[in-house]
């Protein structure tokens, strides 16, 4: 039967295919069945030939090593009669019937589920909400206009820009500026941002979630609000989901799945998850991508690229590599809608944990998966933060907390392939207390050479050697080796001396350390590659989960054996060739500095002589006063623009009252231009203020 399904020639792909070999859903099935009919799921109707053959084996080992229930060959031959259009009997739990296609046109061969009242699906999932429909959202309509979408995106960006400008401008606070007022305004803007992002749909929700990991780029209030963006996107209809699956997998739902649950168990920005049962009885989940997502991404990312380029050019957005950040986000977004990539990730992750029996990773059903549809083994569990359900099952919460961290340490330190989004929705606990991972769309990889550098960083942190820490950060490209790094060294030394030397009772949480790191990085030439920010965020999320599960939880305790193992490793390395190398290097350093010393003294003497004789002149620039003068000029210009803008506005109003609308409009436009110039000047002043604070 599998061959029948796979060999169907159909209209999904938009072209007639004629497949007679037994490719298919499960290579363990050797069914081969022959028939001929007309098949159509789109507007065109096509002829196709079906072959079906089945071995005499009553059962075989299928995917996942489980047995596959099969219908005897004789039975299949009997049922072959149904192919020619007459209502058929069931084959492997489904029946072949003649019916009309979705357009009500040509006769179509579909496989209808066997009429049965018994459901093969497990009992309904607890806590699944009835999700609202996505109808009514402009982005949910696959045929939205690209122009309208671009207008929506730009309106949002411009509104955000103006709001931020007002939040940061002291003159925009009626009754005087205070930090409290600014914080409360920022919170308002952040909450407006979250709502707008939800309205803008999938691309922006996903980007919002990604931004919530970047405390190094965005203000605290924004990061807090964006991290609340739990994919609250409405679900799309089951009809839409089923049509999409059929188009992607190239066969009718009833042919592929014995049962398909219409109500999704989860809906997210990029897709939704339905439970289903395969014809061999295996319980699966089908992750279906939101139709039209690629088109939406294309439009949105085109606009976002322009925005990133503008940010990059504009002084007021700092020195961040906005185009680089955009490219990173675009890569992640496109990767997330490539379910083949997710399936490969799941397979690799499953392989990495094959010897650890307390971690479960769902098996991928490759034959039922494609770019936009992913079928996975159904592995239900209690969400890791659902304390009541965990307690009801008598699970050991402290052990779960330790295991969650340990599993992550294994990913970072041993396999180098890590889950970049371990939020509580993606972690569950199985009946045997093992940890289940879901969602492999966003995975990170720490390549061997990066891992080696990270270990060096770890050792230098352990030795509290600020210079080495900085060199390792430069090697990791997390720090730019430009300009005067003495202030960076002081920050690093402060970090090493204060934050890492606390006794266990003073120990800070990882989240707090991460925040401190980002705070330091805001004033320094640090550039945290997204891999690090993901790792830091992942650890602080897991640490948070750890505290929820067990108030006594200590990250340090769980990580200690791993750290010790690494230090032992280093010690063993040092005892060998490295020690010899180190001694040789020290000898070299001593020799070269002894040799160069007289030359250096001579150079200093020459400088002093040149100064004495007046041959060498020192030109001193007082940068502070230069900046102050520049600021005064900008403010002067801003005042002039305000006066001119106000005057034109008055003239406009006067002319408008007198009925000379043309002149009035001209004046209004002029006033608008001057107002924009005022905003621009304020931006530049802010930028100078910020710069002054940094140095
Ligand atoms: N193999 C599985 N077995 C049981 N339930 C699953 C399985 N895969 C996913 N789920 C359920 O569906 C939910 C959403 O799945 P998943 O996270 O993979 O989707 P997503 O679209 O990537 O969502 P998000 O972006 O929010 O992480 C999970 O939290 C889990 O409850």
UniProtKB/Swiss-Prot annotation:
Transmembrane regions listed in the UniProt entry: 633-653, 659-679
Show the catalytic activity.
Answer: L-seryl-[protein] + ATP = O-phospho-L-seryl-[protein] + ADP + H(+); L-threonyl-[protein] + ATP = O-phospho-L-threonyl-[protein] + ADP + H(+)
**Top-level taxon of origin:** Eukaryota
Q: Which CDD domains match?
A: ABC1_ADCK3-like
Residues annotated as domain Protein kinase? 259-589
Instruction: Give a brief account of the tissues where this protein occurs.
Output: Mostly expressed in leaves and flowers, and, to a lower extent, in roots.
Induction of its expression: Down-regulated in response to iron deprivation.
Catalytic center residues: 421 (proton acceptor)
* Compartmental location: Plastid, Chloroplast thylakoid membrane; Plastid, Chloroplast, Plastoglobule
Primary localization class, coarse? plastid
- Recorded E.C. number(s)? 2.7.11.1
User: What's one GO BP annotation on this UniProt entry?
Assistant: response to iron ion starvation
Entry's Gene Ontology molecular function annotations: ATP binding; protein serine kinase activity; protein serine/threonine kinase activity
Q: Which residues bind ATP?
A: 265-273, 287
Instruction: Give the disulfide map.
Output: none
Q: Respond yes or no to whether keyword Amino-acid biosynthesis is given for this record.
A: no
PANTHER family xrefs = CHAPERONE-ACTIVITY OF BC1 COMPLEX CABC1 -RELATED, PROTEIN ACTIVITY OF BC1 COMPLEX KINASE 7, CHLOROPLASTIC
Homology family: Belongs to the protein kinase superfamily. ADCK protein kinase family.
Query: What does this chain do?
Result: Involved in resistance to oxidative stress. Influences responses to reactive oxygen species (ROS) production. Regulates plastoglobules formation in thylakoids. Together with OSA1, regulates iron distribution within the chloroplast and mediates the oxidative stress response. Together with ABC1K8, influences chloroplast lipid synthesis/accumulation and modulates chloroplast membrane composition in response to stress.
Name of the featured protein: Protein ACTIVITY OF BC1 COMPLEX KINASE 7, chloroplastic
Native source species: Arabidopsis thaliana
């Amino acid at each position: 039967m599998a061959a029948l399904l796979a060999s169907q020639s159909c209209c999904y792909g938009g072209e007639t295919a004629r497949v007679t070999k037994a490719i298919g859903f499960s290579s363990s099935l050797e069914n081969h069945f022959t028939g001929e009919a007309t098949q159509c799921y789109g507007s065109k109707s096509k002829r196709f030939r079906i072959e079906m053959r089945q071995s005499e084996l009553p059962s075989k080992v299928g995917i996942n090593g489980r047995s596959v229930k099969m219908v005897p060959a004789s039975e299949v031959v009997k049922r072959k009669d149904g192919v020619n259009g007459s209502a058929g009997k069931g084959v492997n739990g489904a029946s072949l019937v003649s019916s009309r296609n979705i357009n009500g046109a040509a006769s179509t061969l579909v496989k209808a589920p066997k009429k049965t009242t018994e459901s093969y699906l497990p009992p309904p999932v607890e806590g699944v909400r009835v999700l609202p429909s996505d109808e009514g959202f402009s982005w949910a309509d696959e045929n939205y206009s690209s122009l309208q979408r671009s207008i929506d995106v730009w309106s949002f960006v411009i509104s955000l820009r103006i709001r931020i400008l007002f939040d940061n401008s002291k003159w925009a606070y009626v009754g005087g500026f205070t930090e409290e007022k600014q914080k409360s305004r920022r919170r308002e803007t952040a909450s407006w941002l979250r709502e707008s992002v939800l309205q803008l749909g999938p691309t922006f929700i996903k980007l919002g979630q990604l931004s919530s990991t970047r405390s190094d780029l965005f203000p605290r209030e924004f990061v807090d609000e964006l991290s609340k963006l739990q994919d609250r996107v409405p679900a799309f209809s089951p009809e839409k989901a089923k049509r999409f699956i059929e188009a992607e997998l190239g066969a009718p739902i009833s042919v592929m799945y014995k049962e398909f649950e219409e109500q999704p168990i989860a809906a997210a920005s990029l897709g939704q998850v339905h439970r289903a049962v395969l014809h061999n009885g295996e319980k699966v989940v089908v992750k279906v991508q939101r139709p039209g997502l690629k088109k939406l991404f294309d439009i949105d990312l085109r606009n976002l690229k322009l925005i990133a380029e503008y940010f990059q050019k504009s002084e007021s957005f700092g020195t961040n590599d906005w185009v680089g950040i955009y490219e990173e986000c675009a890569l992640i977004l496109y990767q997330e809608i490539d379910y083949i990539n997710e399936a490969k990730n799941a397979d690799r992750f499953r392989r990495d944990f094959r010897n650890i029996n307390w971690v479960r990773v769902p098996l991928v059903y490759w034959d039922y998966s494609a770019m936009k549809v992913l079928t996975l083994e159904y592995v239900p569990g209690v969400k890791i933060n659902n304390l009541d359900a965990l307690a009801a099952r008598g699970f050991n919460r402290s052990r779960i907390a330790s295991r969650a961290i340990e599993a992550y340490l294994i990913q970072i330190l041993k396999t180098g392939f890590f889950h970049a989004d371990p939020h509580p929705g993606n972690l569950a606990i199985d009946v045997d207390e093992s940890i289940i991972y879901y969602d492999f769309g966003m995975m990170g990889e720490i390549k061997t050479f990066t891992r080696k550098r990270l270990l060096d960083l770890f050792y230098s942190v352990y030795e509290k050697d600020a210079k080495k820490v900085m060199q390792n950060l430069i090697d990791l490209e997390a720090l730019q080796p430009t300009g005067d790094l003495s202030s960076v060294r002081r920050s690093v030394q402060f970090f090493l001396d204060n934050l890492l030397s606390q006794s266990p009772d003073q120990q800070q949480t990882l989240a707090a350390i991460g925040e401190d790191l980002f705070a330091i990085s805001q004033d320094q030439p640090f550039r945290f590659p997204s891999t690090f920010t993901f790792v830091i965020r992942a650890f602080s999320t897991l640490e948070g989960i750890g505290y929820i599960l067990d108030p006594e939880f200590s990250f340090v305790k769980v990580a200690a054996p791993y750290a010790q193992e690494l230090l032992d490793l280093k010690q063993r390395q040092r005892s060998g060739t490295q020690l010899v190398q180190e001694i040789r290097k020290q000898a070299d350093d001593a020799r070269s500095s002894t040799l160069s010393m007289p030359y250096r003294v001579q150079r200093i003497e020459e400088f002093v002589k040149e100064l004495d004789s007046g041959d060498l002149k020192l030109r001193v620039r007082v940068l502070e006063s230069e900046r102050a003068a520049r600021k005064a000029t900008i403010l002067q210009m801003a005042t002039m623009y305000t006066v001119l803008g106000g005057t034109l506005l008055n003239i406009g109003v006067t002319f408008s009252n007198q009925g000379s609308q043309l002149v009035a409009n001209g004046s209004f436009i002029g006033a608008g231009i001057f107002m924009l110039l005022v905003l621009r000047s304020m931006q530049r002043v802010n930028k100078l203020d910020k710069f002054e604070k940094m140095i």
